Amino acid sequence: MLTIQKFGGSSLADVEKLHRAAQLCVRERERGRDVVMVVSAMGGATDELLALAYSVSAAPGERELDALMSTGECASAALCAIALEAQGQRAISLAGWQSGIFTDTEHGEARIQTLTAGRIRSALAHGIVPVVSGFQGIDRYGDVTTLGRGGSDTTAVALAAALRAEGCDIYTDVAGIYTADPRLVPSARLLDAADTRDMLRLSYAGAQVLHAVSLETALEKGVELRLRSSDGVGEGTLVRLLGEGERPPLAGLALSRGRITLVGREAGSALAEMRACLAARGIECLGGAEGKENAFVEVARGDAQRALGALHAHFFAEAK
């Protein structure tokens, strides 16, 4: 059995967290599973590299910017491989180009076109854990490209599909996926399972947990994801294509600036109820619309968090 483990920047922010990520990998290996790790740049590293580039030039070239930005993930991969070796697990760090990740030529927003993964397969065959630099690949000219925001998630999903992995675990600093951002709505509920289509709509609406391109890839390739905490506690949230009998009527709420979007198979007819909920609490609704399986309202930014909390209490109360 093969598992893809993807670790975000906040899960690799310091030496202690690097070792914790390595421990999670070793634990899977002790259960008899092969593992491919995919890593983001350490927390803050990408912003530091970007600031450095713009301190040198007000308009750095796209090619060189990609070459620079990709080094953050490469550093993380090397450090994770070192941490694994320190725990007795053989490992090898691989940049995107070494992993056989071929993209188009759109620097900064490249899309994966083919994935050969020859060196990854070879490492796995020899009991070695490949630690792959996420967020990057190589184009037909041999130039390094980056995949844009959320690119490491996309790398993990693409590898899961190409290698036919049994699982793709996305480790973050939260316990899983909630009915709303728990930082804004403390009463938000952790979901055991979520539908890939619903998560994609929430991502389009501004939810920050999983990026849209990775979810599009998961939907296209039939990859199941599990979003879980990097502290290793709990089972997190399984994201897959749910049957109609399994799908909840409402999946969650997303906030982007002053727009609050409700997503779910019954959300498309909820606009009037959303407006009424806000009106009952004295919150002015500035606009809104309904879609097939979503509806949104617009409020003043100063009212946004209070409106989000009110809508969550209305639609996701325990009695509902």
Language-model features and meaning:
Residues 236-320:
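A conserved regulatory-domain signal marking ACT and ACT-like small-molecule sensing domains
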Residues 1-215, 288-291, 295-303:
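Nucleotide/pyrophosphate-binding catalytic subdomain
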Residues 42, 174-176, 221, 229-234, ...:
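Glycine-rich beta-alpha junction loops
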Residues 163, 206, 222, 282, ...:
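Conserved NTP-handling cores and scaffolds of large molecular machines
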Residues 202-240:
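A conserved active-site cap/scaffold subdomain adjacent to cofactor or substrate pockets
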Residues 130, 145, 225, 237, ...:
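A broad, low-specificity signal marking well-ordered, structured residues that form hydrophobic/aromatic
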